[in-house]
Amino acid sequence: MLSPALLKVSLNRRSSAPVPQDEKMMFHSRNRAASYLQPMIEDQELIGFNRDRRRSSGSIIVDSFELGNASPSRRGSIASGIPMDKKTRRKLSNPVSLHQYTEDPTLAWEMLKEKRPVKPVRQMRLDTPVKPDHVRFVCIGCTHGEQFDISKLPPGDVLLVAGDFTSCGLPNEVHNFNKLLGKLKYSYKVVIGGNHECTFDDTFLKLKQESEPKEMALKQALLSAIHSDSKGGISAKDLLSNAIYLEDNVIELFGITIYGTPWQPKVDNWAFNLSRGQQLLDKWNLIPAGVDVLLTHTPPLGHGDMMNNGQRMGCAELLNTVFKRVRPKYHVFGHIHEGYGCTTDGYTKFINCCMCNENLDLKNEPVIFDIPVHPHTKQFYIQNVKKIHKRFQKKK
């Protein structure tokens, strides 16, 4: 019930037939030894451009550090972890409406694909040096509690984890993952939950609706594990002491804003499941326009969301939110293991960073990308890791 075999049953219920060959060409081979994004022309612009873009259209940054004439230590607060309350939420300039075929993502994509370009992204080599005036992001997701060789993770500044780092969110799984994070040399590790982090979803264990026997058994086992492992009321989220956990909120690191959210279309009554349509759109409406990096568990429709049977699993409202309103430079996600790879719509880079393939085997490489910053900004954030972590926890 709590073994990987259970998870494989759930995954196999959603995939069967092979992907058409022409659709496969939209993604890079999983067997390639390189998974680094080659910066496109617009990546050479300084991150200050995005900062100005946010200022001019309603800033989402509150009490944040910005490099200026004064030294960083004298320019106000050193970081900002900003819950998306009414005061900090940006008014929607381009409201996204529900797609008429949102319940059928494969059909919805057939209607949208002419106006939503998808192109493969050229990738950099794994041994590309980290530059002093760039922030290196390393993206992983969907490890499902599997042990992997941390020595094979490339160097970088920020680790992004796109959810599903456990098989079902058992406290000992979270503890082991947190212990692994503590061994990594990244200055910051930013984590979101996925549908398998059942103990992270406050509503998952409280559901009273009728469930299948295996689902009820899973919930009972989780409740028992939480009760036996709880120490002073500490939640599973609190066990991630070596990471910055985001759930519908944003943090600024190196002057770069990162927004994280775990929700995804409902499949088999797992954690952070919501019905397609208005329920999910309400969550996407919380994402501020102008964030630099969007970290979700689910893919948007059309990017890294195709299963082996040719069906699409992405969210149409998330795609339209990204394309029409938020416009991040990078959108990082996981969830659909068969969709591993990188694409672009000409502005946003979409990264499906699932480490496990559809058989839950760790076959895929991490994916990295760089964002240029001022060297002094990078140095400041590297030197003040503990202070910035402490400030974020206080904001939460």
Swiss-Prot record:
SUPFAM superfamilies: Metallo-dependent phosphatases (SSF56300)
A Pfam family per the record: Metallophos
Residues annotated as signal peptide: none
GO molecular-function terms, A-Z: hydrolase activity
Start and end residues of each stretch annotated as Disordered: 73-94
Family: Belongs to the UPF0046 family.
Protein's recorded name: UPF0046 protein T07D4.2
Organism this protein belongs to: Caenorhabditis elegans
